Amino acid sequence: MNHYFYNMVNPDEMETLEYIPTIPKFLDFIRKQYSDYPAISDKVTTYTYEELVSRVAKRVTFINSLGLEKGSNIAVLAKNDLDAMELFLAIPAAGHVLIMLPNALNDKALAGISMKFDLAGMFVGKEFTEVTANVPCKTWPSTSIGETESAFADVEKDTTAAIFFTGGTTGAPKGAVHSHGSIMRGSFNGVFGPGSILHKRYIAMLPLSHIFGAIMGYMAKLYTGSLTFTCTDMRAGIGDIPVVRPTTLVLVPGLVEIILNIAKAKGRAFLGDLELIMCGAAPVPPRQMAECREFGITLCAGYGLTECANLTSGNCDTDKKPESMV
């Protein structure tokens, strides 16, 4: 089965990539491999890979200054903005456990999570200062950053890196614990796709609190030296498609349906340079695959218990096997 995925990728590009077992080592890799390429952008500010990793290292400096015990649970409640993207990397790179929180949580839910997971603290975006005013843990602005860089923590692939909340598949939400090796294996699995995979353009449509969005929609894109645009509002993110002209989108079937309906109304020009949609986290209707083909877009379908396995399989032969997930 490994050959199915390896054989679909440009072999020259595949030679430049390798499985990296921890987030600190991954940061060193992308800094060296893609230094001057653009990494993340909110359409106003764009950071290269060199700048991104430098800023992550400065955030590690701030985290280290807090004097927390290594392996502490640290949450982030923020929009899908540049700060959240940096904190997603900085917290595990500092040797702590990242918990990305869904934006819809109310004050009671946040208080309960703080106590249940023994949070050492929470980085909070400006939009969430009111709802976090009484949480029983320390809070820091999501903009917090040090003035100088610090070395990344020395962690192993089995060191806990993050906790993601499950959806409805397994009943009541619970925390799925992921090691560095788990996060990075999923991120490496996410690089595979048909044809050229390096230096593409994406919009981070799915929240970083959703592991499919975090792994497939962000980490795997860093792995390939691609440019990822922030998406702090889903409606605005969809409207950005003809503006930033992503080549690839990582979506769930519900979002694919919305985008297809808009394209039917406005025409193919709305989709810009879009050529590939990676779709998962729920069953993908064969009808959507057929409609994407009509717009000249390949829709690759995947499905797995994403909170627990983060990236399990994908179907890049939807024309031949539309019902298959392999």
Label the predicted regions.
Residues T48-E50, A161-R185:
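Conserved AMP-binding A3 loop
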Residues E147-F165, A172, G195-R201:
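Conserved pre-ATP/AMP-binding loop-to-beta segment of ANL
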Residues T247-L251, I259-P322:
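Gly/Ser/Thr-rich phosphate-binding loop
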